[in-house]
Each structure stands twice: as structure tokens, then as C-alpha cells.
């Protein structure tokens, strides 16, 4: 059987790792005398390998053609595990579900019959991240099973030392698993744009996280009312439209406005008459033709007329109406500032009251990220503290400062409202959007941290893609504090581990593809 160089290298690496783990025990685990006994049926072999009888018959018909020192692929046992043999015993190592969890299992048999009594085993599991786990085996039915469950991902190497009945030295058996590994060559890695960095200590601002929601900036939101009752003649503005200050939103025919404009016109006419009378009486008084009392009365009438005109003008100004003398009942409702129409409660031909909320206008260039703070966290959230806002449904992020913390707790909820004011020039933050608000305190040194974008959600679990030989492995992690740029890893990753820091979403997509293909 021809073995590729890649396979030879892989097996050689397994032999080397296993040799170190077992204190220099060779792959076969035999002493020289046992070797002779174990190969009585395979005289054609000139190497030091050892296989089960079935494996020898199935895969070693060309025994005599093997050269010395050649390594072979690990044989597969009836349970799908790796099969090893010595002194007439077959030992298979694999994984099996037990009590709802994956465990390492050893099946020992002799002459086709299961053997469990008199067999003892210990082992060690080494993950791609370098983490190791000691394994203890106990009898479970007709096999031996690890007391410790094996968590995902199932990418690891296991070495177990199995002491067989009547044997003075243990048999070293090995199992390698690469379930879920995403294989990428160096060229493929370069094309994807995945950037690999090393996990290590970092300064993270100690903080607390709150669920929140984007809301209108109430300081820049207005309910537009007509201030005059009337009938709607036209509505050029629509909901969702961006409008400028002074732009016409609606035109209303109002009898009240007609009365006010008529009052202004009448006051202006009276003013004109009073001015003419005053000028005449002043001239006559100066010429000593008329009495001073007539002059003073004319001056007083002029001043009263001026006051009447000013009063009528201010009434129109207060409601935002012009001094038009043509269409006396035409009232143009205009935008009080630049903003977006977010609500509209007016239509053509409708009769509206003077206090009806016909439009809601909001300047969305600034919004609030509101969140609720429990009583135990109130002291940790203060005005002016830095905060990071992350969208729950997109990759939008922003930094800001806490602008308000309620001074009173709700009687029922025992919580206080707080908010962060955000600039929103691109309109990325839309009111109603759910967000996560991280409020930061003092800097804290954490032993393991990674880039925030390196953490992906896979089936509801936080995952970091760890770089291994020939690809990446999805490593479940438990995250801690974050400042929006780096995030603390509490469990699942050790310092020095190399991980996908940027564009890890590409690996998540590849993982999803491979899972779908595996499902078919």
C-alpha cells in the first residue's frame, strides 16, 4: 500500500507526540520479546509496527513488500475508532455518547470477545490550543470509558496507556480527531483577508453592560400643531420626508386667521387716519390756530393706533402666519427646524383643531441610547463616563458619554433611566433599534483578551477561531469585560494562542457551509 509523504509526516508527528506523552513508549508499546510473539503471523514485516489480525489480513497482503521503518495509517476498528493489537488483544479507542456527553471509550477484546475486567487505563487529551486534560477510565458495560466528558470542538489528540491482563507494561494507543476543522492553505488565507494575532494580556476598562434602545432625542423632537382651527386644503409633506426649517408642511383654511388678518388691516387703516389727523393738529397748534388740547388728543389717538397695529402683527407672528392681505384665511403650517417627519396625522379636507398634533418632527442627526439601571448598578453609572453602543442586529458601533442618569428610582421597578447622546450623521441609529450599552470605569489588566470582532456567535455560543496546523478550529469561549475594541476571555483560550482577529466572519461562513454539507 503506497503512503503519501503527507500521511507519513502526520503519522511521524503522532508517534513523536505520543512518545513524549507516554515517557518514551514506542507506538507498539511492546518490549522486544513481546514483539517477537506478536508477529509470529507476520514474518514478512521488517518494520516495528503492530496491527490487529483482521487489519493485517485486509490491508497487509503486501507485507513482504514493506521496507524497514515504514509507518502505516492507523487501522479502524468495528466501532469506528483507532485499532491497536498486542499479545492477542485488540484495543480500539474512539468517542461515544454517554449520559448526553461525548467521552473517550476503550473497547478491549480477545478472540472477538469483549474483555473489561483486569484492564486499566489512564490517558491525556491535548487540544489544538495547547490545553491538556487528564483522563481516568472506568468500566462501563463491556468497555472502559473516560470519567471526564469531552467538550466541543472535537479537535484533539488523545494518548491512553492501557494495561492488559497479565501484561507488565502498558500499551500506548492514540486517537486524533479533527471534527469541525476549517482547512485553509496559506494562499486561501491570504485571499480571505483573515488576520491572525496572538491572544494575550490587555487593559480593559472595567464596566457593566446594559440592554438599551435607540430613542428620539426629545430635545430635538417637536409635536407640530396648527394653533388655529380650520380645514386642510393641501398637505405637501409626507411621513419619512426630510424637511428644512420654514418649509410648508400643510395649508389650512382658517376663519380665525381671516379674522386676525382683518383686524390687522383695520388697525393699519386707523393708524393711517390717526397719523394724518395728528400731523394736521400739530401744524395748527404750532401756528396757534387750534388749542393744545386738540393736538394732544390727536397724538394720543396716533399712539393707540400704533399699539393696535403692533398687537395685531404680534398675534400673527405668534402663530407663524404672514401679513398677507390677499388670501386672508390661508394658513401655511411650516417646519420649526430641520428634521424628519416621523408621524403624520393630517389629510386633505380634514377639519383640524387648533391643538391637534398633526405632525411629529425630529432631528435625527442626534439620538438617545436609553437604558435602565438597577439599584445595585446606579453607583457604577455616572454622568460623563465613557460608553460604547453596539447594535444588536448589525455591526454598527459608536462611542459616547453618559449624558443623563435619573436621580429617582421607580417605585415599582426600583430602577433608574440613563442615556447616552449619540451623533447620527449617517442615520445609522434608528429609533426603536435594540442596542447593548457598555459603560466603562477604570482600566483593568486581564490575562487573556482578543479583538472584539474575533468573537463570533455560533449556534448561540461565543466562539473564537483558533489557528492550528493547516487551518482553524472553532473554540468555544466565555467572554468577560470589553471596551468595545478588545474583549476579555474568561474561559476557553490561553495566552499565546493564535486566533483569527479580523474577518473571522469568513470562517464562520465556511463552518456553516461544512456543517450543511455534513448534514447532507
From Swiss-Prot:
GO MF, one annotated term: transition metal ion binding
Summary of the function given for this chain in its UniProt record: CzcA and CzcB together would act in zinc efflux nearly as effectively as the complete czc efflux system (CzcABC). The CzcB protein is thought to funnel zinc cations to the CzcA transport protein.
Applications (biotechnology): In the presence of 2 mM Cd(2+) or 4-10 mM Zn(2+) up to 99% of the metal is removed from the culture supernatant and is sequestered via bioprecipitation. Additionally Cu(2+), Co(2+), Ni(2+), Pb(2+), Y(3+) and Ge(4+) can also be removed from culture supernatants, although it is not clear which efflux system is responsible for all these substrates.
Main location as per UniProt: membrane
A family per Pfam: HlyD_D23
Protein name, as recorded: Cobalt-zinc-cadmium resistance protein CzcB
Lineage: Bacteria, Pseudomonadati, Pseudomonadota, Betaproteobacteria, Burkholderiales
Nuclease among keywords: no
PANTHER family for this protein: CATION EFFLUX SYSTEM PROTEIN CUSB, SLR6042 PROTEIN
Biased amino acid composition, Basic and acidic residues: 32-76
Gene: czcB
GO cellular component: outer membrane-bounded periplasmic space; plasma membrane
Family: Belongs to the membrane fusion protein (MFP) (TC 8.A.1) family.
Upregulating conditions: By zinc, cadmium and cobalt (zinc being the best and cobalt being the worst inducer).
Recorded coiled-coil stretches: 286-320
Biological process annotations from GO: copper ion export; plasma membrane copper ion transport; response to cadmium ion
Swiss-Prot/TrEMBL keywords: Cadmium resistance, Cell inner membrane, Cell membrane, Cobalt, Coiled coil, Membrane, Plasmid, Transmembrane, Transmembrane helix, Transport, Zinc
Amino acid at each position: 500500500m503506497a503512503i503519501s509523504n503527507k500521511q507519513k509526516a502526520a503519522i511521524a508527528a503522532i508517534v513523536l507526540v505520543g512518545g513524549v506523552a507516554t515517557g518514551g513508549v514506542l507506538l507498539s508499546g511492546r518490549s522486544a520479546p513481546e514483539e517477537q510473539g506478536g508477529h509470529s503471523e507476520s514474518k514478512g514485516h521488517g518494520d516495528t509496527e503492530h496491527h490487529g489480525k483482521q487489519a493485517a489480513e485486509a490491508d497487509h497482503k503486501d507485507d513482504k513488500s514493506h521496507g524497514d521503518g515504514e509507518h502505516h495509517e492507523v487501522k479502524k476498528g468495528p466501532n469506528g475508532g483507532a485499532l491497536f493489537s498486542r499479545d492477542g488483544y485488540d484495543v480500539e479507542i474512539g468517542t461515544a455518547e454517554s449520559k448526553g456527553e461525548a467521552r473517550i471509550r476503550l473497547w478491549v477484546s480477545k478472540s472477538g470477545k469483549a474483555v473489561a475486567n483486569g484492564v486499566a487505563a489512564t490517558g491525556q487529551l491535548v487540544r489544538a490550543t495547547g490545553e491538556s486534560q487528564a483522563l481516568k477510565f472506568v468500566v462501563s458495560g463491556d468497555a472502559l470509558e473516560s470519567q471526564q466528558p469531552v467538550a466541543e470542538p472535537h479537535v484533539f489528540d488523545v494518548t491512553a496507556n492501557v494495561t492488559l491482563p497479565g501484561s507488565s507494561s502498558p500499551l500506548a494507543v492514540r486517537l486524533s480527531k479533527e471534527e469541525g476543522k476549517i482547512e485553509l492553505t496559506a494562499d486561501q488565507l491570504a485571499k480571505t483577508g483573515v488576520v491572525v494575532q496572538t491572544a494575550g494580556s490587555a487593559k480593559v476598562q472595567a464596566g457593566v453592560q446594559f440592554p438599551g434602545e435607540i430613542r428620539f432625542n426629545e430635545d430635538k423632537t417637536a409635536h407640530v400643531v396648527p394653533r388655529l382651527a380650520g380645514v386642510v386644503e393641501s398637505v405637501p409633506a409626507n411621513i419619512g420626508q426630510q424637511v428644512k426649517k420654514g418649509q410648508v408642511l400643510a395649508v389650512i383654511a382658517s376663519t380665525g386667521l381671516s379674522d386676525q388678518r382683518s383686524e390687522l388691516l383695520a388697525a393699519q387703516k386707523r393708524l393711517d387716519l390717526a397719523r394724518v389727523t395728528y400731523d394736521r393738529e400739530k401744524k395748527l397748534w404750532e401756528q396757534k390756530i387750534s388749542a393744545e388740547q386738540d393736538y394732544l388728543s390727536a397724538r394720543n389717538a396716533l399712539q393707540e393706533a400704533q399699539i393696535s397695529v403692533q398687537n395685531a402683527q404680534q398675534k400673527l407672528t405668534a402663530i407663524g402666519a404672514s401679513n398677507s392681505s390677499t388670501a386672508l384665511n390661508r394658513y401655511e403650517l411650516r417646519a420649526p427646524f430641520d428634521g424628519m417627519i416621523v408621524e403624520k396625522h393630517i389629510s386633505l379636507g380634514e377639519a383640524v383643531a387648533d391643538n391637534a398634533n398633526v405632525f411629529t418632527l425630529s432631528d435625527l442627526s442626534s439620538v438617545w441610547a436609553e437604558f435602565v439601571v438597577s439599584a445595585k448598578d446606579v453607583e457604577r453609572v455616572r454622568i460623563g463616563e465613557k460608553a460604547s453602543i453596539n447594535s444588536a442586529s448589525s455591526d454598527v458601533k459608536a462611542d459616547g458619554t453618559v449624558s443623563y442618569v435619573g436621580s429617582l428610582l421607580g417605585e415599582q421597578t426600583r430602577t433608574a433611566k440613563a442615556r447616552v447622546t449619540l451623533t447620527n450623521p449617517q442615520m445609522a441609529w434608528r429609533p426603536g433599534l435594540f442596542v447593548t450599552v457598555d459603560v466603562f470605569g477604570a482600566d483593568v489588566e486581564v490575562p487573556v483578551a482578543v479583538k472584539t470582532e474575533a468573537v463570533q456567535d455560533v449556534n448561540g455560543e461565543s466562539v473564537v477561531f483558533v489557528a492550528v496546523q493547516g487551518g482553524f478550529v472553532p473554540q468555544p469561549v466565555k467572554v468577560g469585560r470589553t471596551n468595545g475594541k478588545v474583549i476579555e476571555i474568561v474561559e476557553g483560550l490561553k495566552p499565546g494562542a493564535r486566533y483569527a482577529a479580523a474577518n473571522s466572519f469568513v470562517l464562520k461562513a465556511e463552518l456553516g457551509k461544512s456543517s450543511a454539507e455534513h448534514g447532507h
